[in-house]
Amino acid sequence: MGTQEQRFFDLFEGHTGAHGQTSILNTQRRGKQEADYIIIREPLTVELVREHLDGKRGVGTIPIDETNMCSYGAIDIDDYDLDLAALYSKVTRLKLPLITCRSKSGGAHLYLFMSEKIAASEMRDKLAEFAAALGWGTCEIFPKQEVLLADRGDVGSFINLPYFGEYPTRYALTENNGSLSLDAFLDKAEDAKISLKDLAAISIGGDGTVLPQGPPCLQQITELGIPEGGRNNTLLNVGIYYKMVDPESWRELLEKHNQEYCIPSLPAKEIVKIQEQLDRKDYYYTCKQEPLHSHCNKVLCKTRKYGIGNGETAPTLSGLTVVESEPPVWFLDVNGMRLELSTKQLQMQVEFQRACMEQI
């Protein structure tokens, strides 16, 4: 067994040509500890990891490597009033292969460690599924990119690592909301490594047995049990789905869904109101409303026959990074495709659209 720093280095292996460094400031903004972040275009070393563990210099790694593969990923929940104990319990209850760590400002990083490298796109897809099942479908996923334009200087985005210094704020959680020691974390993370085959076999709701080819959010909410407080809006959207699937029998299907999956069932008069509402006009899914929003998996939903594929045309933008050259060069993910942009193309809609047409 190697040293702490070597094991930590191996666990968070990522891009070999760059890493991140963080300087913590003595200020907070909207509940988040402020810091200066910078990408260093040099390899991370075991010596730098030791400095991180000793609290001398905070480092982060870029999960995606130069070949668009990764050996770990993370769900980044930036909610600083987060109930970490409840989150830990939900991860455990759903039997997800995630290590729950507190972030520096009180949010959470949920790490997934692989026994083999997998495509960054596969990592992002699976973590998005897990995040949606946990009710955090709109949070950030690392790696932020599926593909890097490595030959153009694109290195991706880094995530801060846990166990900085005496780790008063960044540590892995225990069942009773305590903290794991560094050695215990390393043991747990190494034991939690999973193969691609075993990862692909995990399905947390939304596996198609309920509401086939429907939005994964509705599938997950249904399979977990539709609770009070979310019944009306969930059933409205279930009704929208059934109207598309079976225009003749959707009313009966909606009533059956209510009886089988709502806890407790919605009163009959409320179901009638929903049916009358859907009779008056054709609605589309209310994706921005709860509880759908928290269980959103937009990328997967777009592939479903009765998902949002025909109702939403706005592109999904993520993973913006910059090479601070003269002039600056920007990189952005558009529906999973990596674009290289000038500042003008990034600022002006017509120029941005032209770049999309030329590069995608």
Where are these regions (language model features)?
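Conserved short hydrophobic interaction patches
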Residues: 90, 94, 126-134, 257-260, ...
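Short polybasic amphipathic segments
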Residues: 18-27, 169-174, 329-334
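Short, ordered beta-strand-loop transition motifs
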Residues: 30, 65-67, 104, 151-153, ...
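Modules that initiate DNA replication and primer synthesis
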Residues: 107, 114-120, 167, 190-358
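DNA replication initiation on ssDNA origins
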Residues: 1-72, 82-87, 163-166
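A short linear hydrophobic-aromatic micro-motif
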Residues: 59-61, 95-101
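Short, conserved phosphate-binding/catalytic loop or strand-edge motifs used
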Residues: 100-109
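DNA replication initiation modules
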Residues: 61-82, 88, 115-233
